[in-house]
């Protein structure tokens, strides 16, 4: 795309995305405010608006007469900004402002204290100095490595921060890491980068303090709240490595995880694999000892995974959520338009759990006051795939709706969209389980 700038003074360039005009009206000249811009070249705005063509042009209340496009702080079509760590302007694949809000509007479950948002009134790190340009991926990566409480000051409008490297949690920087986006911040992997990584057994991230097996050490509690994750990718990350596969937005092995008032759009991981999963989130955990009770639960509260066509997450298994050995409490949330894209089931190619893939032994899945709809699994459990291998685990669906989750190659009779192996049949309480 070329832009020729004339008839302007000053600075503060801004790039706006606008709908393409008709061919007959494309004169190449735009009179905008005090400036006259000449522009040419088309771009295709990616997945957020399927098939729509857009033009980018530069505007300003004051601008240089022979300026160049800024590398960060790029407004999107509705005033949101894109912040990068340099390079040419590039709209991230997903425009989060086109996505649905966080949470299920009809969800009214009371949230226990353990599942509520954390206090961030005394942050350890504030990313940004009041402008989108000051909120960079590098600043975020460095803040996560430091630990503590992270907030953002990126200006009054929504901002998307595009990462060029994964933010990794260090296990020796305190027992809790809180990331609060203030309902304005989107973290984007740009379609190539996993966004967040935590692993208690990765030596490179320092083993957590204390004695005992790193797998069972409580480690760090990672809390993400009031924030959006888009276009994270864990494709090409092999299973069985320290940077274990799955979890396009968040990969958490060990430790604890809480997600409150968050959105996850178009996050992905590998298309094939027997256990690899979690387009949005993958959680790996282990029991302290056999019979000791379920593993530390993941809290997912008032959050949205997908939520409308074109925004769903995908992976071989667990299009949105995937876990081995972990339990979940999911409240007032929406999981829709997610896909388990693998195929072959037990042959090792996946395809299980369109929305949720939950595997382990003494595990518990509680879904309360939530909506799970329009998810797809090529094999089993288009809504939920729940397998307690020793049949000690349990699943409960309360005050919720599951619908339009089509049958793959197998499912549990009488439970459309489910495949369940547990100590007892799924506990369905005041819920609608619909085809």
Question: Which residues are covered by each model-predicted region?
Answer:
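Ser/Thr-rich, Pro/Gly/Ala-heavy low-complexity intrinsically disordered linkers and tails
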Residues: 31, 35-40, 60-91
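Bacterial N-terminal signal peptides that target proteins for export
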Residues: 39-52
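Bacterial N-terminal signal peptides
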Residues: 50-61
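Acidic Gly/Asp/Thr-rich repetitive segments characteristic of extracellular carbohydrate-active
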Residues: 127-151
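Extracellular beta-strand-rich solenoid/capping regions of secreted or surface-exposed proteins
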Residues: 141, 145-146, 162-178, 186-225, ...
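The right-handed parallel beta-helix/beta-solenoid scaffold, focusing on the short coil/turn
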Residues: 148, 159, 167, 175-177, ...
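Right-handed parallel beta-helix
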Residues: 181-184, 219-233, 256-270, 287-311, ...
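Short glycine/acidic-rich loop motifs that flank beta-strands on beta-rich extracellular proteins
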Residues: 189-193, 233-240, 268-276, 309-318, ...
